[in-house]
Amino acid sequence: MAKLEEKLTEMLEPGVEALGFELVGIEFVRAGKHSILRVFIDHENGITVDDCADVSHQVSAILDVEDPISTEYNLEVSSPGMDRPLFKEKHYIESVGEVVQVRLSMPMDDRRNFKGKVLACENGMVSIEVDGQQFQLAVANIEKGNVVPTFD
């Protein structure tokens, strides 16, 4: 997770949790003048559009006071969706048995991209099976991770 996302997570998590939601993670996508701040939230009963609106108002109020982003951006608040992003070790633990796609910050064995089944996750390491081969990936080295939806 990049420094800005870490700072924003620390800043916004208490406000999101105060509304009864889990802050799954944050993505800040720089795209010239049109940057996007994506805030992913979840709840055991699911997420509604009204939930997203409530969290958006809360997050906007916090950001207006703290003003941590110097460029213009659009705020998007949503549920993680079927292709749920994986930000924390906890998310990989919850994804054991599922297929995930990950991109590493630093290559391992000349590879940065891995798509496979999560076998286990403990002590900051994710065990992923890719085409019958097992890889041990450090959560700290994962730049981006998502669950790959399967339709059986």
Swiss-Prot record:
GO terms for biological process: ribosomal small subunit assembly; translation. It is found in: Cytoplasm. Pfam families: DUF150_C, RimP_N. Keywords: Cytoplasm, Ribosome biogenesis. One of its GO terms (cellular component) is cytosol. The keyword Cytoplasm applies. Gene3D superfamilies: Ribosome maturation factor RimP, C-terminal domain, RimP-like superfamily, N-terminal. PANTHER family: RIBOSOME MATURATION FACTOR RIMP. HAMAP family: RimP. Required for maturation of 30S ribosomal subunits. Belongs to the RimP family. This is Ribosome maturation factor RimP. It comes from Alteromonas mediterranea (strain DSM 17117 / CIP 110805 / LMG 28347 / Deep ecotype). The lineage of its organism: Bacteria, Pseudomonadati, Pseudomonadota, Gammaproteobacteria, Alteromonadales. The gene is rimP.
